[in-house]
Amino acid sequence: MARVHDVAAYILGERGSMTTWKLQKLVYYSQAWSLVWDDKPLFQARIEAWANGPVVPVLYSHHRGAYQISHWPNGSRSGLTTKERETVDAVVNFYGPKTSQWLSDLTHLEAPWINAR
């Protein structure tokens, strides 16, 4: 199982600089799709339903106060297995071109968010 820090590092390595808000949503969708496609969690870190969408608090504690982020020094891109990279790649390819706001709006329409709030 990957560490959430490795997932964040991998996403930033693939997509480059992005808002911390967008990074949080891409990590969230990576976890969601791992549960669906691979029938197991990608990482064990907790995800919470915050006002602007899902947030992984352990990631937030490292980027708090930043708007844009370009690398994740606490993780390693090589910390993911081939299967984990394939799952994250599919998520990043689909959701990566979307804006942070679009991703946040989408999460607010889905059952996990509605049930958590």
Which residues are covered by each model-predicted region?
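Domain-edge interaction signal
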Residues: 1-117
